[in-house]
Amino acid sequence: RVDKMDRKYDAFLIFDADNLVHPQFMLEMNDHLEKGESVIQGYLNSKNPTDSWVAGTFSIMFWMVNHMWHLAKYRIGLSTALGGTGMCIRTSIIKEYGWDCTSLTEDMEFSMKLLTHGIKTTWAHDAIVYDEKVTTMMASCKQRLRWAQGQFDCADRYIPKLFAAGIKQGNIVILDGILQVSQPYFLLLTTVYLVFSYINAYVPIYTNILYQIMPMSVWQIIGIGQYLFPLIVLLKIKVPPKIWFYYLLYPIFVYSWVPVNILGWFRRHNKEWSHTVHTRAVGLGDVKLTRMGDMNKNKK
C-alpha cells in the first residue's frame, strides 16, 4: 500500500505504540542514512525506570547492552541486531528482501536474514527511543520467555546459514553474527557449567581445565565484571537516585534469566504470541528521562 502512494519514502521507522521518541530521533537516523547505512537500530532507553525494582533492573540491563554490546560492536565495524522498536529500515531493503519472518523474535530474525546476505544492522547511539518496561516479575518472566523461545528458534535456524555464508564469503562480520544469535545457548551452557562447578567443589568428579588455563582469581574477576560494567554505564548516563538501590538488586534479575532461559529452550518450537500489557501513559515532559540532553551536547 505504501509503495503505491504518490510520495516515495527513503526508509521506514518502526516504534511500539507506547514509546516516547526523542525530538532529534529522525535527524539522527537521517544522518545514518546519509552515511549509506540501510538497517539501523536506535538507542533503547526506558521511560519508567523508577516505577518498580523490576522496571529498574530491566532498564539497567538495556542500558548496559546499549553501551557495552551494541555501541562497541558498531564502533569496530561488526553488525548488531534490531531490537523491536526504534528501528529504521531503508525502503530498498524491504522491497528486495521483504519481511517474511516467522519467529517470536522477528526483529532478530530479520537482522540475521540480512546478515547472511552481507547486510549489517548498524547502531544509532544518539537516536533515542524511550520504551516502557514491565513492572512485575511475573510480566517480566512472561515477556523474557517469549524472547527466549524466539531466540532459540532463530539460533537453530540461522547458525548453520550464517556459518555457511560467512565461510563462503570469507566475511568475519557474518561469522560474528553466530555469537549474536547464540547468546541464549551461551547462557544455557553457563548454567550447566555453574551447576557442575558447585557439585565439583564438594564432590570432586572432574578436573576443570579452565582453571588450568588461567587461575581461579582471574575467572572471579571476569565474573565480577558483569556487575562492574553496569556500574560504569550508570555513572555515565546519570541515572535517577532510585536506580542505585535497584542496582543492588540487579543480580537477582540476572539470575532470574536462568529458569526463563531453560524453559524457553524446551518451548523453542512454540510460536504462540503472548501479549505484553503496557499502561504507563506519560509524555516527554512528565517524567525525568536519561540522556535527554546528550544529543544537544554532541551537536555543539
Predicted features by range, described:
Residues 1-10, 23-24, 28-103, 145, ...:
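Long helical/loop segments within the catalytic core of UDP-sugar-dependent glycosyltransferases
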Residues 16-20, 100, 114:
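The conserved acidic donor/metal-binding loop of glycosyltransferases
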Residues 63-67, 141-162, 227-231, 260-264:
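Catalytic core of nucleotide-sugar-dependent glycosyltransferases
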Residues 104-110:
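Acidic donor-binding loop at a coil-to-helix junction in glycosyltransferase catalytic cores
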Residues 111-130:
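Catalytic donor-sugar/metal-binding loop of nucleotide-sugar-dependent glycosyltransferases
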Residues 133-149, 275-277:
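Nucleotide-sugar-dependent glycosyltransferase catalytic core
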Residues 180-270:
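Membrane-embedded multi-pass helical conduit in multi-pass membrane proteins
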